[in-house]
C-alpha cells in the first residue's frame, strides 16, 4: 500500500502547550511521526510525506534560485494529478536513491539525510533555550534519533511539498487514482499523530474490503482512510468521519469501517498522553518519559493522568 502521511512542523500540537514548550511539541510530534513511519515500513508499505515547502527547503539547506531547477532535463515518472494546475511528478534521484514529488516548475532533491532533518529539527533555536531550562540536559529532546535512524528507511520515503490546507493537498494526491498513467489502484492516508499504531492495526485497515475504508477518530474525525475509487474526495472539515461515510454512500460506494482503539486515538491534548505511556512501545513513550512525563493516579477520581517531573527535582 502507498500511504500518504500529512505532517506539519508549524506550531504542532498547540493543545499540549500547558505541558510542553513549543520546541518540545515539535520534538514530540516528530517522535510520533517516527512511530507511524516505522510501523508502516515494517509491513512493507511505502510512505509519502505531505509537508510544507518551507520544511523541505530548510531540510535541504536550499534557498531562492537554488531550489528552482529546470525540470526539462529530468527523467520523471508521472505519479499524481492529471490536471495541469496541480500536476505532480516523481523524480528518482540516483545519487541519493530517494524519490521526490515535484511540481512542473521545480524539483527539490531530498537526500536521506535531509529526510532525517525533516524528522528532527537540528537547527531549531528553541531547542537550546528549552535545553537551558532543563539544566543543560538535551537528552530528552534527542533520545529518539539514533533509534529512528535504525528503524526508518529514509531513502524509501517520497516527499511531496504542498502549502495548501489538508483537504486540497490530500485530494491532489488522490487525483492519481484517476490517472491511467499511474500505477495506483488504491491509496491510504494515515495521520502522523497516531502514536498507538501497530502493524496489526494497520493491516486490519488495509485488509478491509470496500471502495472506501474508514478508521474514525474519537472526536468524529477521520484518522485513516483507504480510497479505492477514483471519484472519491476527502473533506477533513468538522465531523469528517460522518461526512466521508455519507459522501461514499451517496455515491453508491461500498464502505468499510475499522473500529480500532489504536487507530482511533490521535494524540492532541494532555489527557491523551496516558494512552501513549500505557500503549506505545516506540519512540513516543520514550520521548515522554525522557521529558519527565509520568503516569499519575488521581486518588480522588481513581483515573490515571500524567504528571511532569523536572530533571532537577528531588525524587520523593
From Swiss-Prot:
Residues 92-107 have a biased composition (Polar residues). Keywords: GTP-binding, Nucleotide-binding, Nucleotidyltransferase, Transferase. Guanylyltransferase that catalyzes the activation of (2S)-2-phospholactate (2-PL) as (2S)-lactyl-2-diphospho-5'-guanosine, via the condensation of 2-PL with GTP. It is involved in the biosynthesis of coenzyme F420, a hydride carrier cofactor. InterPro entries: CofC, Nucleotide-diphossugar_trans. This is 2-phospho-L-lactate guanylyltransferase. It catalyses: (2S)-2-phospholactate + GTP + H(+) = (2S)-lactyl-2-diphospho-5'-guanosine + diphosphate. Pathway: Cofactor biosynthesis; coenzyme F420 biosynthesis. It holds the Pfam family CofC. Residues 72-85 have a biased composition (Low complexity). GO terms for molecular function: GTP binding; phospholactate guanylyltransferase activity. One of its GO terms (biological process) is F420-0 metabolic process. The keyword GTP-binding applies. Belongs to the CofC family. Homodimer. Gene3D superfamilies: 6.10.140.50, Spore Coat Polysaccharide Biosynthesis Protein SpsA, Chain A. Residues 72-107, 119-138 are annotated as: Disordered. It comes from the Archaea. It is an enzyme of class 2 (transferase). Its EC number is 2.7.7.68.
Amino acid at each position: 500500500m502507498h500511504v500518504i502521511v500529512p505532517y506539519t512542523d508549524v506550531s504542532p500540537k498547540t493543545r499540549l502547550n500547558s505541558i510542553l514548550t513549543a520546541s518540545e511539541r515539535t520534538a514530540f510530534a516528530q517522535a510520533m511521526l517516527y512511530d507511524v513511519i516505522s510501523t508502516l515500513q515494517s509491513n512493507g508499505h511505502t510512505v509519502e510525506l505531505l509537508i510544507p515547502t518551507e520544511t523541505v527547503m530548510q531540510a535541504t539547506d536550499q534557498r531562492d534560485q537554488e531550489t528552482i531547477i529546470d525540470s526539462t532535463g529530468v527523467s520523471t515518472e508521472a505519479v499524481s494529478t492529471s490536471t495541469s494546475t496541480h500536476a505532480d511528478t516523481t523524480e528518482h534521484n540516483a545519487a541519493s536513491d530517494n524519490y521526490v514529488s515535484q511540481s512542473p516548475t521545480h524539483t527539490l532533491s531530498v537526500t536521506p539525510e535531509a529526510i532525517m532533518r525533516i524528522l528532527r529539527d537540528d537547527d531549531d533555536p528553541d531547542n537550546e533555550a528549552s535545553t537551558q531550562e532543563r539544566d543543560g540536559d538535551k537528552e530528552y529532546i534527542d533520545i529518539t534519533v539514533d533509534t529512528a535512524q535504525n528503524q526508518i528507511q529514509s531513502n524509501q520515503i517520497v516527499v511531496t511539498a504542498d502549502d495548501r490546507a489538508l483537504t486540497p493537498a490530500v485530494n491532489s494526491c488522490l487525483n492519481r487514482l484517476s490517472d491511467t498513467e499511474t500505477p495506483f489502484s488504491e491509496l491510504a492516508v494515515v495521520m502522523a499523530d497516531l502514536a498507538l499504531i501497530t502493524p496489526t492495526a494497520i493491516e486490519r485497515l488495509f485488509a478491509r474490503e470496500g471502495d472506501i475504508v474508514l478508521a474514525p477518530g474519537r472526536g468524529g474525525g477521520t484518522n485513516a482512510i483507504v480510497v479505492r475509487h477514483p471519484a472519491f474526495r476527502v473533506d477533513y472539515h468538522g465531523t469528517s468521519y460522518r461526512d466521508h461515510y455519507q459522501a461514499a454512500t451517496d455515491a453508491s460506494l461500498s464502505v468499510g469501517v475499522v473500529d480500532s482503539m489504536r487507530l482511533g486515538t490521535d494524540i492532541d491534548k494532555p489527557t491523551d498522553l496516558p494512552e501513549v505511556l500505557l500503549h506505545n512501545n516506540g519512540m513516543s513513550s520514550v520521548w515522554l518519559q525522557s521529558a519527565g512525563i509520568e503516569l499519575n493516579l488521581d486518588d480522588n477520581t481513581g483515573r490515571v493522568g500524567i504528571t511532569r517531573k523536572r530533571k532537577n527535582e528531588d525524587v520523593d
